[in-house]
Amino acid sequence: MCQAFAVPERIAATWSEVSFLGKGWQASLDVDGNRLAFWMYGCGPVILLMHGWSSRGSRLMGFVKPLIAAGFSVAVLDAPGHGHSSGAGSSVIHAGKAALKLAGHLGDVYGVIAHSAGSTAALWALCNGLSVQRSVHVCGPSSMTTVVLEIARAHCLNDRQTAEFCVWVEAFMGVTLASIDLPALAMGLKHSGLILHDGDDRVVPVAQSRALHGAWRRSTLIETRGLGHRRILSDPHIIECAVRFMMPTDHQLEMQA
């Protein structure tokens, strides 16, 4: 059970992802003794792409070409324990710290596009020093306690075991669960945000994004159907919405909030 929370599956890149990664400028940083792999594309204000659990940065490659065409540069990272980055254990805090380290290395980061657990990691980073003009959150949990309790239920833990598991999780991450729940995460939501979620997502319920939208005054929520949790990342309309939202001359989506 602890492994299910802390050790992601390291999935291989597809052939198209290998080709995509080969076209970027690859570099790495040291984050808490682990090698953080990242790739840079384009020239302009930096957009950081953050992937989800047991995934890799190249799974968001569909956003890169349109962002470059819109005048941005793109930083694609593999979170600790994922893809080409080293490390066995990981969490949203590991990923959030990696984002902070990369942002510090790159200088100003204009925006973030984050999927699933990467969204939670981005929300935590935004509360802990990451400053952006805009961020896009795709199918992400907005409260970590909900995720941990769902894992406990899936493993049929009783109340005592669940409490012990929560204590272990907090010790592993080095922060309290309350600090990764929406009331705390909302403190970092001073900028404009776009929230995208599919109603047929069977991994993260759309209620998580609705709650995030409710707590974020400067956000827009767009709900889709039929895309699920992962296919949404390659949907042309979703990609277009995210890229248009990032463009500083296009306030259409923001004004709908």
Where on the chain are the PLM-derived regions?
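An N-terminal hydrophobic leader/cap segment in hydrolases
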Residues: 1-28
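Short alpha-helix in the alpha/beta-hydrolase fold that links the catalytic acid
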Residues: 191, 205-214
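Hydrolase active-site cap/lid region
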Residues: 127-175
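Short beta-strand/loop motif that positions the catalytic acidic residue
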Residues: 188-190, 195-197, 201
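Catalytic histidine-centered segment of alpha/beta-hydrolase-like enzymes
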Residues: 227-237
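Gly/Ala-rich beta-loop-alpha elbow adjacent to hydrolase catalytic centers
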Residues: 113-122
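Alpha/beta-hydrolase active-site loop
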Residues: 89-110
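Conserved alpha/beta-hydrolase
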Residues: 57, 64-86
